[in-house]
């Protein structure tokens, strides 16, 4: 399973990349706004900076919901760097745009997916990735991980090459559950990635090893 970091913060991306386990980055308009990145030109420069840090796919989202504008924005984003994957919302015009981009050889990430039906249409249109949002589904008492498992099964049944890129990861349990059901990728905050390293018995064991070493070696 691949690990992407879900942020537009360059320092967090560098820190995650330094661990040696980072495979890519996902961003969205909210994350860009959080970093104070304003204006299309500055956003494009920021995407290029991210691509220069990580040797992997970087999802950059279109803002438009109109088909023609989606195409224009997506082509501009794809031209920035070969690592760019155009992120498109799972709406009617988005599915049309994904089909267009697929025919042009432009890779896409179909985002804001909350049902197996949406995921099926995204794969049929040729999406490179599909992003089910597990945390947001859990928030409304739905089964986010169950949806991931359903999508994985559907794609295997019909031999779709679309990768399941799980988003809205809230904790380490989400990561492990998604791994167990066969997700291709999880994208999560740095805190969740680092959380996988944490276990109290590891800390206790390390403390004991060091204490025993100091007893013998001073």
Predicted regions: what they are:
Residues 29-33, 112, 128-140, 181-202:
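Glycine-rich phosphate-binding active-site loops on the catalytic face of alpha/beta enzymes
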Residues 5, 60-63, 87-90, 111, ...:
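Glycine- and other small-residue-rich loops at beta-strand/loop junctions that grip anionic moieties
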Residues 155-218:
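C-terminal alpha-helical cap/extension of soluble enzyme domains
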């Amino acid at each position: 399973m691949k690990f992407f970091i879900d942020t537009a913060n360059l320092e967090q991306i560098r820190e995650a990349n330094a661990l040696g386990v980072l495979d890519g980055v996902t961003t969205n308009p909210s994350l860009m706004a959080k970093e104070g990145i304003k204006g299309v030109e500055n956003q494009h420069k920021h995407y290029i900076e991210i691509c220069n840090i990580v040797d992997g796919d970087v999802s950059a989202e279109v803002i438009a919901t109109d088909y023609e504008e989606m195409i224009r924005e997506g082509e501009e984003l794809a031209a920035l760097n070969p690592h760019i994957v155009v992120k498109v919302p799972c709406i009617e015009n988005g599915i049309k745009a994904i089909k267009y981009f697929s025919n042009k050889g432009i890779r896409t990430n179909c985002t804001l997916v909350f049902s197996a039906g949406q995921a099926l249409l995204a794969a049929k249109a040729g999406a490179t990735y599909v992003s089910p949002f597990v945390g947001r589904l859990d928030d409304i008492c739905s089964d986010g991980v169950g949806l991931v498992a359903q999508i994985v099964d559907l794609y295997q049944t019909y031999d779709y090459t679309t990768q399941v890129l799980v988003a809205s990861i809230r904790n380490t349990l989400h990561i492990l559950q998604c791994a167990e059901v066969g997700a291709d990728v999880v994208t999560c905050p740095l805190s969740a990635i680092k959380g996988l390293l944490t276990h109290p018995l590891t800390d206790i064991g390390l403390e004991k090893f060091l204490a025993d070493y100091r007893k013998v070696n001073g």
